[in-house]
Amino acid sequence: KNKLEKKLKSETDTKVRKDLIDKIKGYYRQMQQMPCVMEMDEEYRRLKYVRYADDFLIGVVGSHEECGQIKANITQFMKDKLKLELSAEKTLITQAQEKAKFLGYEITVRNSKATKRDKNGVLKRMFNRKVVLLLPREVVKNKLIDYKAMRVIQTNGKEDWKPKARSYMMNCKPEDIVAQFNKEIRGFYNYYSIANNVSTLCKRFGYIMEYSMYKSIAKKQSSSVRKIKKKYSKDKDFVISYTDAKGQCKCRVFYNEGFKRKDAQCDAKCDIMPNTNFLPAS
């Protein structure tokens, strides 16, 4: 490939240049199909353990039989030392390309031949063998149903999500309705903000919540969504002005910060105990 590229720089004949370019592209296609590293060293083994409360996940570089032995050892240890029973139904051995559920996420390893140019313009397979965190669609659906913000109807054999008014909020002030929706949207987004598909699914979550909020306020004021949006719209935002208990004029703005994916904070010192020592006042 390098020889052909060098020859291409000095070649002036149009037909020869075209043939050289076709050959170079062919070499690039072959290179993109070849693994850049050894896929599996048969003698290499590794185990990674992650726990939160009573949920844990173990990643193993090894065979299925070895994973079975590890599971059996953990089951015996928990029974003998901790006096706990390991649920056989929930404790599964999952191949890396399949989806494993952990703390509300689905975790998998991407198998992709897709390419992307790096900052130097070099075409690379950046997505293959990467661990991916996914927000499950069912989690979004169930959360919206739990909030009573959505109803599901069947259209031509497919699910259709429709926002609806939250009737139990009819006694709340409009600004309090907006505040409640904002709190729920931020809470859901912040928890799943490191998921690879958070932008797509949280946009849908946000849309349903937004129109549920419109419908809730419209129902409270015996109005329509169109009239409510027109009444409270201000510079592309939904803003409710109100007077607080102290007589001060304030505004409540509906969530408008988007659903961009955030980077995981791998260096967060969440396990370090706080220093509670203090010096007495002199």
PLM regions with names:
Residues 1-282:
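Non-catalytic terminal/accessory segments
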